[in-house]
Amino acid sequence: MENQENCSTPVMTTETAGCAAVLKKKLSDETSKKIAAIRIILMILVVFAHNNYNELALPGGGAVFNQSVFGKWVQLLISDGLARGAVPVFFTISAFLLYYKKNSYSVVLKKKAKSIFLPFILWPVVNMLFFAAVKFIADVAHIGFLDGVGNYDFLTWTPKEWFSNFFGYGGDGILYLSHFWFLRDLIILTIISPVLSLLYDKAKVLYVAAIIYIEFVGVYTYFIMPESLFYFSVGMIWAKSDFDIFELAGKIKWYEIIPVFLGLWFILWKFQRFPVTTVTLMAFADFLMLMKFSQILIKNEKVYNTLVYFSTYSFFLYAVHIKILRAIIRTVWIKVLPMTNGFFCLAEYFGVTILMIASGIGLGILLKKICPPLFNILNGR
């Protein structure tokens, strides 16, 4: 089965259905199936999180967002609630697979250079060329509503701006592909993974106390996000310990965890109290719900096989959705259906997001059929 050698790579990037088969040698069949099945569900939640607006303006000005109170709470529940746990699960499983395989450091770095770093560098270039092409077409064909989509901005960047846009350090701190902060942090955490392992082995209690403090207090860590370190550490501890997070989540009843999640979500968005702590607790509750939900996904063989198939394209969807697809689909959608009332706002929220998901997966399938080598390179295979 293809790409079996990459089963220790981050779950968000290059792990394929073949990994489930390989991991059965060490993991239980149930655990490996849960990991394989949940990827595309998590990615769908990530896409919903990234098409979430409380205010929106067309090029040239003019507010077009007129969300209703009901619509606002729907978006808050999905994008700022249920989707909160997706990235934590990705970090946790990525670290778990990395530490569980116990590969040598040189092997890990070699694999990650191909599976994470190469796509991390290539995808911004793909996006720059895409938007330059859109700008060229808009200018030549005089397509006015695309003027605000395409650009040649990268041609004016200084060396410092190139570095800032690729890595997010310096400038405004935002990467050109803003959602690639996940990959950046994963690269850094992979590089320092032996150090984290050593620190944990030497002082377990102190290490756990430190990462909890960093996460819940929101300590500023310049090179990586606090949640990245926290959930990566959770995955490391999971791999090094006897307990199973899936088993832990399975023991929690739905009627126990759902009220906790909803209560924290309501407190956060209604009263805006203790935002860092509340967000962290809510994300962890959502994290456990998603882990628990994976048990449902593997019960039906057809459902499981379908999820594993689409999971092959989860990284492609991740890479292409937030700039390329969102820019085009949202621009065209708002041109046809301006968000002038609550109904059209909700229609945009669900319609654009669903189209982004379908288009991203569809483009991935098409590219894989037309040019498998290019698909593999862009996806770190």
Question: Which role fits each region the language model picked out?
Answer:
Residues 1-212, 301, 309, 338-381:
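Membrane-cytosol interface segments of multi-pass membrane proteins
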Residues 23-26, 230-233, 241-316, 323-349:
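Alpha-helical transmembrane segments and terminal signal-anchor/GPI-anchor hydrophobic tails
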Residues 44-51, 124-125, 209-222, 258-271, ...:
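Aromatic-anchored segments of alpha-helical transmembrane domains
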Residues 50, 85, 283, 287, ...:
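Transmembrane alpha-helical core positions of polytopic small-molecule transporters
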Residues 74-88, 171-184, 216-234, 249, ...:
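Interfacial loop-to-helix transition and helix-capping segments at the boundaries
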Residues 96-100, 197, 236, 240, ...:
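Short glycine/serine- and small hydrophobic-enriched flexible loop segments
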Residues 192-200, 205-243:
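Loop-centered beta-sheet repeat module
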Residues 317-320, 376-378:
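Conserved active-site loop/cleft motifs that coordinate metal ions or position small ligands
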